[in-house]
């Protein structure tokens, strides 16, 4: 979409924000603190990525029963809105695929804005792939 207008981009963001919720429990919930910010005063994207990785790992263990995974890919990470100090950020995770040794997890991140009385906005989405390993860090089959 080479000639995409700003209006088109805003409409796509609005459509993403109005997508139905994923069918999962909250994997983790964190209040963002001043230590999490970048030089622009918003939460550093790397902090969000780190929590996405943790949330996806929680879901992988919860859905497969296997207790050791390593992250092998983070796909299509989309930062939709900034996150601010004081936001209560929820990381929802949903298993999208379980293979022989790997599991794919979709993570949706929502921020309840500080002082917003419960109103949340979708801020980030990602797809994360994990591979099951044993205590020797060797790839193993899931649940078998």
For the regions a language model picked out, list residue spans one by one.
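HotDog/MaoC-like acyl-thioester-processing domains
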Residues: 2-10, 16, 22-28, 84-85, ...
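A conserved, well-ordered hydrophobic junction motif at loop->secondary-structure transitions
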Residues: 36-51
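Active-site helix/loop of acyl-thioester processing domains in fatty-acid/polyketide metabolism
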Residues: 47-66
């Amino acid at each position: 979409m080479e000639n995409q207008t700003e209006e088109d981009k805003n409409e796509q963001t609005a459509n993403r924000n109005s997508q139905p919720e994923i069918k999962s429990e909250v994997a983790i919930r964190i209040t963002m603190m001043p230590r999490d910010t970048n030089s622009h005063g918003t939460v550093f994207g790397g902090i969000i990525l780190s929590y996405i990785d943790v949330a996806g790992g929680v879901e992988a263990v919860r859905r497969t029963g296997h207790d050791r995974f390593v992250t092998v890919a983070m796909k299509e990470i989309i930062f939709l809105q900034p996150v601010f100090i004081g936001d209560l950020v929820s990381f929802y995770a949903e298993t999208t695929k379980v293979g022989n040794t790997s599991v794919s997890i979709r993570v949706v991140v929502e921020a309840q804005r500080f002082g917003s009385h419960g109103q949340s906005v979708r801020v980030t989405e990602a797809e994360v792939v994990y591979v099951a390993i044993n205590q020797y860090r060797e790839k193993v089959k899931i649940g078998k």
